[in-house]
Amino acid sequence: MVLPVEPEYEQALSELQNSLKPFLAANPDYEKALEIVQIPERVLQFRVVWEDDQGKAQVNRGFRVQYNSALGPYKGGLRLHPSVNLSILKFLGFEQTFKNALTGLSMGGGKGGSDFDPKGKSDGEIRRFCTSFMSELFRHIGQDTDVPAGDIGTGAREIGYLFGAYKKLQNEFVGMLTGKGLAWGGSFIRPEATGYGLIYYVEHMIAKAAPEYSLSKPETLVAISGSGNVAQFTALKVIELGATVLSLSDSKGSLIAEKGYTKEFIKEIGQLKLKGGALESLAQREGYTYHAGKRPWSLLPVVHVALPGATQNEVSKTEAEDLIKAGVRIVAEGSNMGCTEDAIAVFEASRKAGAGGVWYAPGKASNCGGVAVSGLEMAQNSQRLAWTTDQVDQKLKKIMAECYEICLSAGTKWSGEEIKDGVLPSLLSGANVAGFIKVADAMREHGDWW
């Protein structure tokens, strides 16, 4: 059988297979689990016809990849972006399966969305698209079946429209989406969760590998890419702790702050992005330098912590080498698969070289805070109650600490490396192996492989 070319999915699968080699060599029976888990349980593709402001019919493709339900209902975001295709959604759903396993919560993996572009669309057009999209998706989701969430292009407004459409179609008010408004079933710190969780994870990495670059020190220089939800709240948490944020970016370029970003400026960028604006409109601000068409990684002479927070494959091999020249010690993904395979190889080679090397954390571990709080939102909905901000934040800190410990332990045991003095274990191997074992064991107990 000739399979379609799916580069993003094949990259994610290749990364997992490479990480699992030492574990599978010692546990060959799990080869069958790997063969089975890589195929989604169900793939849905459908037509979405909606009316534009001129009264004309427009059409887009809608998708939902229900990847794996071994640990709970399918769980993963809905992405609205012109680049959306089956390869990207399979990669995201595959990664989501193991990411959700690392949270310790009862969630399977899935991903969906459409090649619809919300940029430049009116509020009415987005509402009509969401209503049409949900008119097909509603028959495949539910609080105990599949619980979608937001993602790129799908914010609070879109979640509201999707929830309203589902409520009308099913005549029930249930927690079948996460990222909801606080007044109707949402959770405190859900918007902040991916960025906050990333920093909680990174704090553990720094404490073990590079305590001299504590985020409580203004001398610690942090590079962040992106300027959406993840990047904004990552930056705000870094500033709150005391370190210096040097960069943000968007699809058109990077904005470098010589003396560091302020909380007020980050919030201003948040308002700009809500209106669909670009960072280039802030290029003339004193103390900031805009670089059109460039990502931040090669623009900074000195950086200690790098946090990709934009999209997949946003750090290349050359950029990874430039970060090492700039003195980076910690790289943790806020975006999914933010680093290319070649970039990861550069970081892992640096780690293996010994003391002073780069310690890299993959997105499935370091950015699982977002879906963790989505899981906490599901728990609150099931009990018909709402926890306080502090309660949710404390639970998130605990989940990220446990995720770090799981990855550290599995990386130490199953990396296949002889861990020498000064060499840190691979969090890449640890995250992949720990997530895989948890999913595979549940599948075996369900009779999905033997």
UniProtKB/Swiss-Prot annotation:
Protein name from the UniProt record: NADP-specific glutamate dehydrogenase
Keywords, comma-separated and alphabetical: NADP, Oxidoreductase
Family to which this protein belongs: Belongs to the Glu/Leu/Phe/Val dehydrogenases family.
Active site, per annotation: K111
Keyword Oxidoreductase set for record: yes
Pfam families per record: ELFV_dehydrog (PF00208), ELFV_dehydrog_N (PF02812)
Enzyme Commission number(s): 1.4.1.4
Catalytic reaction equation(s): L-glutamate + NADP(+) + H2O = 2-oxoglutarate + NH4(+) + NADPH + H(+)
NCBIfam families attached to this UniProt entry: PRK09414.1 (NF006929)
Keyword Oxidoreductase: yes
SMART domains, alphabetized: ELFV_dehydrog
GO CC annotation terms, alphabetical: cytosol
Self-association state and partner proteins as the record states: Homohexamer.
Annotated organism of origin: Laccaria bicolor (strain S238N-H82 / ATCC MYA-4686) (Bicoloured deceiver)
GO molecular function, one term: glutamate dehydrogenase (NADP+) activity
InterPro entries to which the protein is assigned, alphabetical: Aminoacid_DH-like_N_sf, Glu/Leu/Phe/Val/Trp_DH, Glu/Leu/Phe/Val/Trp_DH_C, Glu/Leu/Phe/Val/Trp_DH_dimer, Glu/Leu/Phe/Val_DH_AS, Glu_DH, Glu_Leu_Phe_Val_DH, NAD(P)-bd_dom_sf
Family annotation (Gene3D superfamilies): Glutamate Dehydrogenase, chain A, domain 3, Leucine Dehydrogenase, chain A, domain 1, NAD(P)-binding Rossmann-like Domain
GO biological process, one term: glutamate biosynthetic process
UniProt superkingdom: Eukaryota
